[in-house]
């Protein structure tokens, strides 16, 4: 399928997607009933969309195009109420978190969807292993060239986004020692990590043509890069965050990305170059492994800085942009989080360290989501 022309969209508008866990009490393992829930809510959603993701234990909540985080929060809140009621009617529960702490990938059923079934044929068991749960944020762009500039700019802050959203310390019944283990699942995919270097939209079109020759890539949705342009929507999509445990944190993360995008495209402080990516995977690893305690290295100067310090600097830089687009509340909340030194991964570990079980952890996450 050829790459569509870049659809011009209003700059800095938002679209947010949350991949949620569908769980089956009282054992709190993943359920295989997302299709049933989607059928139950499809005529009750007035704004946004509830839809499938890769496997039957995943439920995606997606906003419409939103002006700001307040509009997105309102849409999510309304969807949340409908989904929670449908889940209760079917004796199911819903929660966030980047991974389910003890599910077995072998039990996961891929959705009866043509694209997902084709992906299963291409990637085999890797698709079942990809039963992990992330937050994706789309930001509107006025042109393809702006999208490429924004993609490179946001890529500088991938470690910051990962560290702030880290919520997947447990996997397959084990403490992984990572703050965010979810991104590791995609390491075997041939398109894992950053997009190959291009400097403008014309070069991106040539890159996509080359990738399509592999027969594995039919559309932009078949690419699993950390950040990717989405020409159909006219956006850049950031895909590195774990799904948070609360809607409020999800909205705050979206506000962070929206404000960072506004700052990048209005200030244009960076002259991007391929060398910017020289230490990308090392810095990304630090964020996944250690969260805000990780240390990132500047590929140009060799300077090293903790992610705590780097994130506080970012929040300070983008504060004026956040004020202009109505995202100041998000930046203030994230600042408090960084100063406190806590993220959701650490809260999960604290629960288990205090005698909680992994079953109890999922139950608590469901209570958090339902009680917000």
UniProtKB/Swiss-Prot annotation:
User: What's the family?
Assistant: Belongs to the glutamate--cysteine ligase type 2 family. YbdK subfamily.
* Catalysed conversion reaction: L-cysteine + L-glutamate + ATP = gamma-L-glutamyl-L-cysteine + ADP + phosphate + H(+)
Q: A Gene Ontology biological process annotation? A: modified amino acid biosynthetic process
Assembly information from the UniProt record: Homodimer.
What domain of life does the UniProt record list for this protein's source? Bacteria
Keyword GTP-binding annotated: no
Pfam families found in the cross-reference section = GCS2
In Swiss-Prot or TrEMBL terms, this protein is called Putative glutamate--cysteine ligase 2
Signal peptide location? none
Question: Origin organism of this chain?
Answer: Escherichia coli O127:H6 (strain E2348/69 / EPEC)
Q: Which UniProt keywords apply?
A: ATP-binding, Ligase, Nucleotide-binding
Query: By its UniProt entry, which NCBIfam families does this protein fall under?
Result: gshA_cyan_rel, PRK13516.1
Which InterPro entries is this protein grouped with? Answer: GCL_type2/YbdK_subfam (IPR050141), GCS2 (IPR006336), Gln_synth/guanido_kin_cat_dom (IPR014746), YbdK (IPR011793)
The broad enzyme category this protein falls into is: ligase
């Amino acid at each position: 399928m050829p790459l569509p022309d870049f659809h011009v969209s209003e700059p800095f508008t938002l679209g947010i997607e949350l991949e949620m866990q569908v769980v089956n009490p009282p054992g709190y393992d993943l359920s295989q009933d997302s299709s049933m829930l989607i059928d139950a809510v499809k005529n009750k959603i007035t704004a946004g969309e509830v839809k499938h993701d890769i496997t039957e234990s995943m439920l995606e909540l997606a906003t419409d195009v939103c002006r700001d985080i307040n509009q997105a929060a309102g849409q999510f809140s309304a969807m949340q109420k409908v989904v929670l009621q449908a889940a209760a009617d079917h004796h199911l529960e819903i929660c966030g978190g980047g991974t389910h702490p003890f599910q077995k990938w072998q039990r996961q059923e891929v959705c009866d969807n043509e694209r997902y079934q084709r992906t299963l044929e291409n990637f085999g068991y890797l698709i079942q292993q990809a039963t992990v749960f992330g937050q994706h944020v789309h930001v509107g762009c006025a042109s393809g060239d702006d999208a490429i500039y924004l993609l490179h700019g946001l890529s500088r802050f991938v470690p910051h986004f990962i560290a702030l959203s880290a919520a997947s310390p447990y996997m397959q019944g084990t403490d992984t020692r990572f703050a965010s283990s979810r991104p590791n699942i995609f390491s075997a995919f041939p398109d894992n990590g950053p997009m190959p270097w291009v400097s403008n939209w014309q070069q991106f079109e040539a890159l996509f043509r080359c990738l399509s020759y592999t027969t594995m890539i039919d559309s932009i949705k078949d690419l699993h890069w950390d950040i990717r342009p989405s020409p159909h929507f006219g956006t850049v999509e950031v895909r590195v965050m774990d799904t948070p445990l609360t809607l409020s944190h999800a909205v705050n993360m979206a506000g962070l990305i929206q404000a960072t995008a506004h700052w990048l495209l209005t200030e244009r402080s960076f002259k991007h170059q391929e060398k910017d990516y020289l230490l990308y995977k090392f810095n990304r690893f630090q964020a996944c492994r250690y969260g805000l305690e990780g240390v990132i290295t500047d590929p140009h100067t060799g300077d090293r800085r903790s992610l705590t310090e780097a994130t506080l600097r970012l929040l300070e830089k983008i504060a004026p942009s956040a004020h202009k687009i109505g995202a100041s509340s998000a930046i203030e909340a994230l600042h408090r989080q960084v100063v406190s030194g806590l993220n959701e991964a650490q809260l999960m570990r604290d629960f288990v360290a205090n005698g909680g079980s992994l079953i109890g952890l999922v139950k608590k996450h469901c209570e958090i989501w339902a009680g917000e």
